[in-house]
Amino acid sequence: MHELNQHKIAALLPQRRAQSNKGNYGSVAAAAGSLAYRGAAALCVESALRTGAGLVYLASVEPVIQLVLTRTPECCALPCRTDADGGILAADAAAVRQRFTEKPAVLLAGPGLGPSAARILNALLTADAKWKAAVLDADALNALAAGELGQFPLLPTNTVLTPHPGEAARLLGCSVAQIQTDRPAAAQELAERYLSLIHISEPTRQE
């Protein structure tokens, strides 16, 4: 187990070369947002851009994309149809997965997906998916904890889970107090259970 802080993480970010372009710095495909939770997608896109991704694609419903493009016009839009719950239609999520088969990207999924999360994730995480890595947060973690992604979820080899203490408790089937009592042990158990890298964030509200 390795303890990271903001200084160590900053040192890991590659320096930009003077002679380079956005194609030299990788791609992120974000599946985020829904009619009810639009701001989550904006935060996803901005975070990916600020940490150095060369190309950031957003797969979401049209009203969410319109909002995000007013804040980050450099984002590449992948408009999706809206399902009955106001989220991304699963068939369109499958098309997003297929789009990145030949030119793999990092998948960022979960924030703001709402009740559609499990359907979307099951369309994105299939045996033939070619994601370089995946970062799963928020509603993706709730779907994972509820068993809606199957007994053996098809997570990419380089998957990062970023639960807050409440989400970590749901993933492990324990109380938030148990998570907070020994966060390193909880992170270790999550890593072993889901074969993923784990970052347990600080609580943003009273859990």
Each PLM stretch: what is its role?
Residues M1-A134, N142-V160, P165-S201, R205:
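Small-residue (G/A/S/T)-rich helix-start motifs and N-terminal tracts that mark the onset
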